[in-house]
Each structure stands twice: as C-alpha cells, then as structure tokens.
C-alpha cells in the first residue's frame, strides 16, 4: 500500500450501489480512514441517512466534496458523467487523481473537460466486489504516473483482483467481466434447476451448483491449467459427463456464451462519448 494513502482524502461522487460497495471495502480494510471520506448523493435526506449509517461525510454538493480531496472517484452513471465533470472542473487541482468507473467513457472524454495534466484512470469493477471476489480492470490516461497506478491497485484490491489493460480493451472487459456475473448466474440457475428436475431439494441444488461453479473457477486460477484440460479430466471415457457435454454442445452453449460477450462488448462501443 502506498504509505500515504490512509491519510489522503477521498471524494466519492455518486454513492450508489458500486460506490457504496467500494466505500465500505475501503473502510473495512482501513485503506482510507472514515474521516477522510467525502461522498455525494442527489438528495439531502439520503445524504443525512448515509452519513449517519456509515460515519462519513455525505453531501449533495460535488464541488464541495472535491475541494480538499486528493483522490476523486467518479461513480455516477455514464449519461451524467460529462455534466458532473464540468461541474467540478473549476475546483480540480494539479495534484488530484481522478478515477472513473463509468462504463464506456474514455479517459480522453474526461481529460478534455478538466485542466490540462490531471491524471485520469478508467476502471471497471464488477458486482462480486460486494463479497471481496471482484475483478477490476483499469487503464490510464496520458498524465498518470506510477504512484497513481499504485493508488488504483490499492483501492480496487480491497474488493478483489486487479489487472491493468490497454484502453482499447476496456469495452471487451465490459462485455466479459463486468457483464459476466449475469451470465454465470444464469448458468448456475440452470444447473440448479436441472438438479431440481432430478429430484433434489431446491436449496441443496442451489448450494451444489454454486459451490461447483466456485470450485471450478478456483481450480482454473490456482492450477493455471487451460479450462479444456480440466474439463477433460472430469469427462472420463464412457462416463456420465460426456453425455452431459454432448447435450451442451448440441445446445450451442459455447457459441451462445461467446456471442453474449461479443454483443455486450459491441453495445459498450456503441455508447460513444467524445
């Protein structure tokens, strides 16, 4: 962890679902002290409620929140990000780091709305961040320095794994790891339904399916083996698994999942921000 990050002041603009997940992780792991977190929401009543609940400062004033911040985390929707950046631009200082988690919004879009030389990082976490098992990919704008990278790695490392990619790959990240949990939930749900169809109680079927998905993913990560090799190790000759795989192949599982990632990635590209 960068030595000074605990003492840095963090502004979180947009304390919605992901903003709240990140803020609570920062607090829980003492990456940023509660008294140094300033967040914003749209309504004063909600600001008061969240301030009382989490022990941080919450306001409806974006400019006030960023005034003394060292790090500004933009957690607002892509459709309003431009307005928010223009709102705070006049109060941004040279040594502040801007991190955006808005899908499809390039670093250049943010940079040209801020004073020249402001470091901007674009990140894409996913919802398993809620349980500390998230996957965040990030890329850097033109003015980002090494210490800024380390800050980003530290912050997003509180909610899971972190990887740096070239910005040209960020739309693919959106289609794969950001949207991916929804695909996995559908697969998990279908596995459990198959168990129910064969007579298992629903709660046990769901537990079996969830742990199977979790354990299989862990084997890929910890062994480093290609998924195809791990699959083949389960599919013994003339066994039950081969019959199951045949059904999946006939149903087009592989092609359907590939097309889902491609389609979601293409949709991310269509949301042009310039």
Name the predicted role of every residue range.
Residues 1-53, 57-60, 64-68, 196-197:
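NAD(P)+-binding Rossmann beta1-loop-alpha1 motif at the extreme N-terminus of oxidoreductases
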Residues 2-6, 210-274:
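NAD(P)-dependent Rossmann-like dehydrogenase/reductase catalytic/cofactor-binding core
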Residues 22, 43-45, 53-54, 62-67, ...:
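Rossmann-like NAD(P)(H) cofactor-binding subdomain of soluble oxidoreductases
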Residues 33-36, 94-96, 203:
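Short acidic capping loops at alpha-helix termini that bridge into adjacent secondary structure
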Residues 37, 47, 65, 201-208, ...:
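Small-residue helix-packing motif on alpha-helices
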Residues 109-119, 135-172, 185-222, 267:
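Internal alpha-helical scaffold of NAD(P)-dependent oxidoreductase catalytic cores
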Residues 173-182, 231:
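A short glycine-threonine-serine/GTX helix/turn-capping micro-motif
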């Amino acid at each position: 962890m960068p030595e000074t990050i605990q003492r840095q002041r963090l502004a979180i603009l947009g304390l919605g679902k992901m903003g709240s997940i990140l803020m609570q992780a920062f607090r829980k792991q003492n990456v940023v002290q509660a008294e140094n977190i300033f967040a914003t929401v749209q309504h004063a009543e909600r600001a008061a409620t969240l301030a009382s609940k989490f022990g941080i400062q919450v306001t409806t004033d974006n400019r006030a929140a960023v005034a003394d911040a060292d790090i500004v985390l933009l957690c607002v929707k892509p459709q309003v990000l431009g307005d928010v950046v223009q709102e705070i631009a006049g109060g941004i200082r040279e040594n502040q780091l801007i991190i955006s988690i808005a899908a499809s919004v390039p670093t250049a879009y943010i940079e040209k709305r801020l004073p020249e030389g402001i470091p901007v990082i674009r990140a894409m976490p996913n919802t398993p961040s809620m349980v500390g098992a998230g996957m965040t990919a990030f890329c850097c704008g033109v003015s980002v320095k090494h210490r800024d990278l380390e800050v980003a790695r530290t912050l997003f490392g509180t909610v899971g794994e972190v990887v740096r990619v070239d910005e040209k790959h960020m739309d693919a990240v959106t289609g794969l790891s950001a949207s991916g949990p929804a695909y996995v939930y559908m697969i998990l749900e279908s596995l459990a339904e198959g168990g129910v169809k064969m007579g298992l109680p629903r709660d046990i079927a769901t537990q079996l399916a969830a742990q199977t998905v979790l354990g299989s993913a862990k084997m890929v990560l910890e062994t480093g083996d290609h998924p195809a090799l791990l699959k083949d190790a389960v599919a013994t000759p003339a066994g039950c698994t081969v019959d199951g795989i045949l059904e999946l192949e006939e149903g087009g599982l592989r092609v359907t999942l590939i097309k889902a990632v491609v389609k979601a990635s293409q949709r991310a590209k269509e949301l042009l921000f310039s």
